[in-house]
Amino acid sequence: MKQTNRKADLPLLLLAVVLIFLIVCPVGMIFAKAVIQNGRLDFSPAVQTLLNPENAHMIGNSLLLGVLVVLLSTLIAAPLAYLFSRTKFARYRVFDILFMIPFMTPPYIASMGWILFMQKKGLLQQLVPAAAGCEKIFFTLGGLVLVMSLHVFPFMLTMLKNAMLNIPSSLEEAGAVFGAGFGARMRKLFLPLLSGNYAIGALLVFVKTLSEYGTPSTLGKRIGFEVFTTEIHRHATVAPIDFGSSATLSSVLVGICLCMWMLQNYITTRKSYNLVSGKGARRVEQSMSKGAAIGAWAYIVLVLLIAVGVPYFSVISTSLINLRGYGLAPGNFTIAHYVELFTENEKGLSALKNSVFLAVTSATICAVLGTLLVLAVRKSHSKLRKVVEAIGLLPEMLPGIVLVIGIMLFWNQIYNILPLYNTMGIMVLAYVVLFLPYTVQYVTSSFTQISDSLMAAGQVFGGSPAYILRRITLPLIRQGIATGWMMTFIIAFRELVTASLIAPPNTLVVSTFIVREFEQGSVSVGMAMAVLCVLFSTTALLILNTVIDRRKEH
């Protein structure tokens, strides 16, 4: 029996070795670089980095930004969550798609759109000359908070809406029967029941804000607002390069994120309510007066205009402008910038090819490795399986820039053994490490719906493990594999921070091409690439949803 168990655990052990090499070693290298100097333990450089007034100010900036983004995203999402869960607006499923557009839009593209719209003599002032001077209001901390909140509020909206849908209407009706008005029901009923879900959503938004690089690097730098990610990036890329400071700041950021995850787990266990049971629960739409309905429509349209309309209008119109000096003047529009990307601009075409190659390769490797990981964990009964699964999901808990710094340090250290650093191979490896959790989660979700009796039936009828895997398991989990592949492809195609840190010399991808053109003044060409990037990602997502819906029907 022990011999059989060892054979069953062998794939798990091999995967454990691979994951430790790919994930744990780079993370460990960050902490080692922060405290080991010249081969001996030395905390003084790390302490000096943390006590540096500029770094202390930067840490304060990051925490302040995280809190403000949580507050503003809550103010935006809470009314929408109530409308889409308790009123007639819940019938309009199209809003579920529309309000995911800001979240699916790359943050650096959205922030560029806002910069083009709000800058001096920008698109807003061309449309409304009376708005001159408004750039002084936007290019502040408030503008940065607004742009980042417009990116993450759909996540908060989804969390709150799903939580509200689980609150039985009978509880609200009971409150009304006992004389509680709308405000009292919100205060005494909804808020306590939502506190656990809201805390989880707020902590996740906070961590995502701390981990975000795209918006702080484009808009934050313009207002001189430095945060964790931009400082870590600067220490790792701008001379004099200081990997020690970069590793120290990365360690602090990891510590904050892990504390947030621990706090989330604590809240989940202490502040959760069992609102869904075997007993049926009906949903009753709250009636709305004509004035309230008009106000609700106005709010929904306003949020969509600000979150989707402004950045997309700016990006698309700028990509079509012939001469920037003439702006939105009639006759000043052309598609020449799109034609240039596919004909004259060799770097643009090369960036597209590189992005497609990296996205396809990393998505395929993630699909294979993630599926093998889930299969090995499910098959094994060893205590090691929980550890291996946790390692596979670890990249999701850590900021992407931290993992990339760790990969840089680790693979640079072993360059003489494995000369992968400074090649396209290191980019593929980094993408695989960053996006492996997507496949693991989607395949695991598919596995939870498979009854063990199916496997047992296959064994009873003489099926070998390979036959059962090929004819039973894989057909049942292929949707999860396909979903994980597509999500990895979409996110890898537009990834910015990894490409900006470890791309080989003179190698551009879509994201770095857009940023470079934007910063060097070829804004229209950069925005043309941004439009193609968004169209590519959106089309892939729509294809994915169509395939999933068709399979559900069959």
Where would I find each of the regions flagged by the language model?
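Short, Lys/Arg-rich, polar N-terminal cytosolic tail immediately upstream
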Residues: 1-6
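Membrane-water interface segments at the C-terminal ends of transmembrane alpha-helices
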Residues: 7-39, 51-165, 193-214, 218-220, ...
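Short cytosolic juxtamembrane segments of multi-pass membrane proteins
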Residues: 171, 272-284, 454, 463, ...
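Peri-membrane helix termini and adjoining interfacial loops of integral membrane proteins
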Residues: 34-45, 119-130, 221-230, 271-280, ...
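The alpha-helix within a helix-turn-helix
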Residues: 175-176, 458
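Alpha-helical transmembrane segments of integral membrane proteins
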Residues: 262-299
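Glycine/proline-centered hinge or cleavage motifs at structural transition points of membrane proteins
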Residues: 178-180, 192, 461-462, 475
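Glycine-rich helix-loop "coupling/hinge" segments at transmembrane-helix boundaries
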Residues: 116, 214-240, 327-331, 490, ...
